Amino acid sequence: MGATKKNLSRRSFIGTSVAIAAGLSLAGGKLWGAPAYIPNLLSPNFTINGVQLGVITYSFREMENQSAEAILQYTLDCGITSIELMGSTAESFNGRPENKMDRRKFYMLSRKARKNKLTKDQEKELADLKNQQTSYDKEIEAWGKNRSLDGFTKLRKMYNDAGVQIYAFKPDYLLSKKNSDANIVYAMKAGKLLGASHVTLELPRDTAHTLRLGKMAEKNDIHVAYHGHEQQNPTWWDSALSQSPNNAMNIDLGHYVAAGNEAPLQILKDKHQHILSMHVKDRQNPGNGKNNMPFGKGDTPIVEALQLMRDEKYTFAATIEYEYKTPENSTIIDEIKKSIAYCKDALES
């Protein structure tokens, strides 16, 4: 491979990537409006020159329909076949009752209450929302006593039949410190049934809890990969990694750059054996504002990181996470396609 190609700047990929994205749209055109979940339509385990490229389904959070079926269709529409699946999607498919409380309003009123800025009508509204949440908590507690794992097996089959593999599972609250061992085991078993090699969550501050999770992961034959935001630094995961071989890393390269870490590629070189998946987004460094940007326009070395993974044959997945604001003349799906094309171009250059 010529040095000229290897040393292309990140921004030089943008024009080529847009063209590739257009190609993906044309190639994937049959998916739009077509019957969903056509078996073997796409190849599972989407890899480019040895690098597994996926998307976290959090990227679809602003889409109106959040059902497992809709999330699958969005994935297919993007032309991707490997995902990190959000827990709420899987649990809803498995029969978890829906929380119909207006959570946005609840959080907004709760913030105002802490500042003593509620009107009398708002005080009544917040009290009603709290009562709704209490009733829902009781409903969930009752459901949890008799819940089954069958839905996760069915969900995996539906996704696999469409050519989509779930390599990571983010079970939200289920892995938190306050949860029972039964809930944690449930989350880990769900991950296994979905086909995931690891479950993900934010790295807890409590080392006793990371020890607990690591030991439970050993018993359930799965790994726990810890995610981070701007708390990330080169030694941030060290305690958890030392506690169990089943504790691992779900590093976020964009947040790592936004945190001001000066050598983002070095941590990949030093700890690749502990990384099971890496979130890929393009954030600016602190000096430039830390904003989420379209791929190629921020300060995150996406091209260099992907090519490092390819050249050194690192085995962890690169998970695209869509977080920047959708342009008025575009859609979430189209922007994710552009991000995929940008990564594809990097890996093929």
Residue ranges and their predicted role:
Residues S88-R96, K100, K115-N116, N146-I166:
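Active-site anion-binding loops
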